[in-house]
Design a protein with these regions (language model features):
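Canonical tetratricopeptide repeat
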Residues: 7, 41, 75-79
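Conserved structural position within tetratricopeptide repeats
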Residues: 29-30, 64
Length: 87
């Protein structure tokens, strides 16, 4: 289940294991390329792995998704301006 894969990856992110988190979220993004939450999570992980250009690519992509709500749009725009550490 792609949602479980996302959740496992996010759990690794929350305990600062970004390498393992990236492995799971990479799979989740491939399985659910149009899910804004998964792409946002993946962007956050990429940022923590110092892959900032790729992180911004995923965050910008979230802004184009039809299921992105207003609160997420606001949060993504803050990340795009200030990065993750200041959002």
């Amino acid at each position: 289940d792609p949602y479980i894969i996302d959740s496992i990856g996010w759990a690794y992110y929350l305990v600062d294991d970004y390498i393992k988190a990236e492995k799971f979220l990479n799979i989740a993004v491939q399985l659910m390329p149009d899910d804004p939450i998964v792409s946002d999570h993946y962007g956050d992980i990429l940022w923590k792995l110092d892959r900032k250009i790729q992180a911004r690519y995923f965050w910008k992509n979230v802004l184009q998704m039809k299921d992105t709500d207003e609160e997420m749009i606001k949060n993504i725009n803050i990340k795009l301006i200030y990065g993750l550490d200041n959002s």
